[in-house]
UniProtKB/Swiss-Prot annotation:
This is Kunitz-type serine protease inhibitor vestiginin-5. Expressed by the venom gland. The lineage of its organism: Eukaryota, Metazoa, Chordata, Craniata, Vertebrata. Pfam families: Kunitz_BPTI (PF00014). The keyword Signal applies.
Amino acid sequence: MSSGGLLLLLGLLTLWAELTPVSSKDRPEFCELPPDRGTCMGFLQAFYYNPSQKGCLPFMFGGCKANPNNFKTLEECKRTCAA
C-alpha cells in the first residue's frame, strides 16, 4: 500500500474513533452527577450529561466551582459521556 493510502487509512480510523460513542461501561462516573450551577453568579450556557435521558442537555452555569459533569460545548459532553 502506498504512503498516501496508509495516511488515508490512518485518517479514517482516527475519525471513526472520534465519532464512536462512549459505551456505558466506559463512561466516567462523574457523568452520573446532577447539573451543578456552581457558587458564582454568572449566566453561562454549559452542558451536562443526563443519564435518564441518555443525552447531553444545556443548563446555566454560574462560572466557577461546579462538579465535573459540566462541559463548555455539546460536542465535548457527547464525546465524554454520551452512549
